[in-house]
UniProtKB/Swiss-Prot annotation:
It holds the Pfam family ECF-ribofla_trS. This is UPF0397 protein BCAH820_2657. Keywords: Cell membrane, Membrane, Transmembrane, Transmembrane helix. It comes from Bacillus cereus (strain AH820). It is a multi-pass membrane protein. InterPro entries: ECF_substrate-spec-like, UPF0397.
């Protein structure tokens, strides 16, 4: 079994706290469904630290949000946040990609966009199915929530998560226009 490094554990703690606290704020778009800018945290931390960190930040952070908010822990949605964080972290495993070192190409950005979008869709469908099957929620309510949450998460991912991650990578790019004279 791989051990988690101290750096990774700290990143998971910070990411979970940020995601958990920022998850308390959002804009209502459907019954119990919000556009939450906190989703960008999963994109950035997943890209920086990988799928395991993304998974744990999503799980822990969403549990923190639900606990502080006082509406009870909705495990289907907690797991869906973990799934989203996990898929956002796939990009970190690509050879040549590093937000920390500013190394990436257009293929990496496309890969992050595609895996992120697929992860969001899978995660939200899972949460909806979980609510219907396990929690006994009405189908028509869940359809509205799933559609609203998918649209909201895609918007946050494309407008905040992806650009912030690319911006961090660009700012860390190791390049210079200076030339060494011989």
């Amino acid at each position: 079994m791989n051990k988690l490094s101290t750096k990774l554990v700290v990143a998971i703690g910070i990411g979970s706290a940020l995601y958990g606290i920022l998850g308390l704020w959002g804009f209502t778009i459907a019954p119990n469904t919000f556009i939450k800018p906190a989703l960008a945290i999963l994109t950035v931390f997943g890209a920086l630290f990988g799928p395991v960190a993304g998974l744990l930040i999503g799980l822990i952070g969403h549990t923190v949000t639900d606990t502080i908010a006082g509406w009870g822990i909705w495990w289907g949605w907690v797991i869906s946040s973990g799934i989203i964080g996990f898929t956002m972290g796939f990009i970190q495993k690509r050879v040549g990609f590093s937000v920390k070192n500013g190394t990436y190409n257009k293929g990496d950005i496309s890969y992050l966009a595609i895996t992120g979008l697929i992860g969001i869709v899978i995660a939200i469908i899972f949460a909806g199915a979980f609510d219907i099957i396990v929690m006994g929620e009405p189908f028509d309510k869940i359809v509205i929530q799933v559609l609203g949450a998918t649209i909201a998460d895609v918007i946050v991912f494309l407008v905040l998560g992806l650009p912030i991650t690319i911006g961090l990578a660009k700012s860390n790019k190791k390049h210079t226009h200076l030339k060494i004279e011989k």
